[in-house]
Amino acid sequence: MKNVTDSFVSLGHWPSAGSFGFNTDILATNLINLSVVLGVLIFFGKGVLSDLLDNRKQRILNTIRNSEELREGAIEQLEKARARLRKVEIEADEFRVNGYSEIEREKLNLIDSTYKTLEQLENYKNETINFEQQKASNQVRQRVFQQALQGALGTLNSCLNNELHLRTISANIGILAAMKQITD
């Protein structure tokens, strides 16, 4: 803090340069030197500065032109993308509609196929039942026939004695002899 106050105090001790005013001595103020330097700078620097500004202007114009071309290309790509999107949406709607109708058609085909399969299974079941019924009735008939035959044989065996047996044989021989005489 002391250094700050000392610097203000030392400012107060500087010798005064004089009063404020214009110095009219041209050589003392270096106006000629300044004007010569400015003239040389303007004369030689004008071309360089002009070239720099022209180059900068061309770069800016090229950048703007490129930006416009990119913008137009982006707009064109956006329109193409929108057209593709519309086309894809239309195709998706067609696929959706066709898909639903295809699903319905497949569903109906599946139902028809299932009904036909069930009908075939029902027919096969009925044929199997009829076959089994015929087989069972044939077995019953065969069984009844065998039992009747066994019963008849049992009756014949119990009824037949030797005398009846000999008479039956004699009667059959007589029938055969009569048939032979008719045929001769």
Swiss-Prot record:
Transmembrane segments: 27-49
One annotated GO molecular function: proton-transporting ATP synthase activity, rotational mechanism
Main location: plastid
Residues spanning the signal sequence: none
Domain of life: Eukaryota
Protein location: Plastid, Chloroplast thylakoid membrane
UniProt keywords, alphabetically: ATP synthesis, CF(0), Chloroplast, Hydrogen ion transport, Ion transport, Membrane, Plastid, Thylakoid, Transmembrane, Transmembrane helix, Transport
Function: F(1)F(0) ATP synthase produces ATP from ADP in the presence of a proton or sodium gradient. F-type ATPases consist of two structural domains, F(1) containing the extramembraneous catalytic core and F(0) containing the membrane proton channel, linked together by a central stalk and a peripheral stalk. During catalysis, ATP synthesis in the catalytic domain of F(1) is coupled via a rotary mechanism of the central stalk subunits to proton translocation.
Subunit structure, as described in the record: F-type ATPases have 2 components, F(1) - the catalytic core - and F(0) - the membrane proton channel. F(1) has five subunits: alpha(3), beta(3), gamma(1), delta(1), epsilon(1). F(0) has four main subunits: a(1), b(1), b'(1) and c(10-14). The alpha and beta chains form an alternating ring which encloses part of the gamma chain. F(1) is attached to F(0) by a central stalk formed by the gamma and epsilon chains, while a peripheral stalk is formed by the delta, b and b' chains.
Miscellaneous comment in the UniProt entry for this protein: In plastids the F-type ATPase is also known as CF(1)CF(0).
Protein name in the entry: ATP synthase subunit b, chloroplastic
